[in-house]
Amino acid sequence: MQKVCWPYFDPDFDNLGERIYGPPCRVYIDNDSIQDCTVVKVNSENKQGLLLEVVQILTDMNLIITKSYISSDGGWFMDVFHVKDEHGNKLTDKSVINHIKHAIGTSRRESDFIKASEANNNSLEPQLADHGEHTAIEMTGTDRPGLFSEIFAAFADLHCNVMEAHAWSHNARLACIAYVSDDNTHTPIDDPSRLASIEDHLSTVIRATADPASNSTHVGHKENETDGFLAGQGKGCMNSNMERRLHQLMLSVRDFDEPFCEPSSLSLLSSKLEYCDHKERKTTIVSIGNCEERGYSIVTVKSKDRRRLMFDTICTLVDMQYVIFHAALRSDGADAFQEYFIRHIDGRALNTEGEKERVIKCLEAAIERRVCEGVKLELCAENRVGLLSDITRVLRENGLTVVRADVETQGQKSLNAFYVRDISGNKIDMEFVESVKKEMRPIHLEVKNEDTKIDTVGSDEPTASASATPQRQPQPHRFSLGDILRSQMERLSLNFVPTK
């Protein structure tokens, strides 16, 4: 028998540097220095994208970042975050503190592998967790009233069960990510011919009334294009990765540009009216200057404070291929001020007015696209094929358009959150909204008003006060959502279950 020899590698060799010089990433949690918040300090070897990874971890834990200082110039990375839990208190739970330390340390050790994978794929897509039971489908296009309903109806016609879906609309553009399975076998859809059929069907729906003068709708397979219809098996996600992908999709359809000025249909006109109404109340101000001495561009952002604000800003800069060297954030609970010292990934500052204008518009869009102004409807139902199609069709037929959707399946239940507005662009009369709960009994329906209060750090889902008198607005059409859903009782009543 021939002997086979190979070199021996000590398994501790990879950790030799850490044993000599200490761990490459140190995380400190300080609960003593400041009375009303916890200080999280991160010291690490500097790697491109590490700041985003740390912010993603804090974001996924629903922590509120009230102040932050970042410095990563040279070979070392130093971050300080002042954070509170979702209730506005200091972090006292030892398991939460240990999870932060472990998650950031693990993220740092895996950073080199992730960056190598991204380099090999030549892609900035977030690394998503594997969901072996679902097929991910991504869609982008020109938004119009009723499009969400048409998309969900198409899934029902294609015998696809929607297990999870998230959709944003902004400036008459739409981005949607859906995780589906075959409604008969409950397995991922991996047949190329069937995926092609799904692509063709959904492409037809999305492009049905798209203005030919608009370039905001693109259709193509994932391996060929960066936007349009994208399909792939086994793509799941954590919360912030899903949101980062939605940011990327909205950026790909240029939602930072104004909608087409001369819409050829009433549906596009209503989107334009919504956009104009939003622009009148815009509170985000972005400016860019240059630091000639150090070769930085200085980006300042003033806006209303809310949760995930820092994440939205940083992931947009990273996806636009800018490197953040220094940064500072502070907030007073109502307003937030952010400052970033950046260069392009090739080492240059923002020298042209055109590039500065594009960064300004993209950051404004990234901050504003998450803020939905409308009425939020929360429903919990027994999951079945066609449920989302039925719900969104009822809303569409009665003059409500969905501007954002979050759908999740937990066991046999489907948890649905729809942000809706009047199709004509007017505010929905809150008197009818307040009467919905009484009319819907025993069916449970949560109604939250997003018009009167922005999503601040004090409340992730702001609601209208029950004692507050809603501002009266002239309405061309008055209706009752309770009556609408009651008319569909034969089909829907057996599927709704209480959320509590």
From Swiss-Prot:
Where in this protein does the record put region Disordered?
A: 450-478
Pfam families the UniProt entry points to: ACR10_N, ACT, ACT_6
Q: Which residue stretches does the UniProt record annotate as biased composition, category Polar residues?
A: 462-474
**Keywords, ordered alphabetically:** Repeat
Residues in ACT domain copies: 39-121, 136-213, 298-373, 376-459
Cross-referenced InterPro entries: ACR1-12, ACR2/9/10_N, ACT-like_dom_sf, ACT_dom
**Keyword check for Cell cycle:** no
Q: What does the function comment of this entry state?
A: May bind amino acids.
Q: What is this protein called?
A: ACT domain-containing protein ACR2
Source species, please? Arabidopsis thaliana (Mouse-ear cress)
